[in-house]
Amino acid sequence: MLNRRECGAAVEVAARRHLERAGLRWLASNVCFRGGELDLVMYDVMSVVFVEVRYRQQENHGSAAQSVDRRKRRKLVMAAQLFLQRHPFLAQVPCRFDVVEGAGRPLQLHWIRDAFRLDDC
């Protein structure tokens, strides 16, 4: 049986593969900054996509996507800004924030494109 960290890593790998099959290109994983982390950074037809991957075995407390609250969105935006500062060639490209939620066993993935916008933070 996988512990929480191993389970999270497995869901992130599954999410990355799912997005790659959909045509996105992988740029980075688990990019850490003070105060925030980007699970996946992908590229999709002239857009940089910052992807938050969430997993819940059960939805007793809401869906995994619902757990990306205003505070978490702010952290993701700050981390994305720092990422773009370190990669200025990508800062000229539009960006968006997606969420991939995983639930259950066997794992079911649900990709939410454009899950939130900067003005939602």
UniProtKB/Swiss-Prot annotation:
Q: Name one GO molecular function term.
A: nucleic acid binding
Pfam families per UniProt? UPF0102
Extract the Gene3D superfamilies matched here: 3.40.1350.10
Q: Which domain of life is it from?
A: Bacteria
Family statement drawn from the similarity comment of this UniProt entry: Belongs to the UPF0102 family.
- PANTHER family reported for this sequence: UPF0102 PROTEIN YRAN
What is the name of this protein?
Answer: UPF0102 protein XF_0554
Species whose genome carries this gene? Xylella fastidiosa (strain 9a5c)
What taxonomic ancestry is recorded? Bacteria, Pseudomonadati, Pseudomonadota, Gammaproteobacteria, Lysobacterales
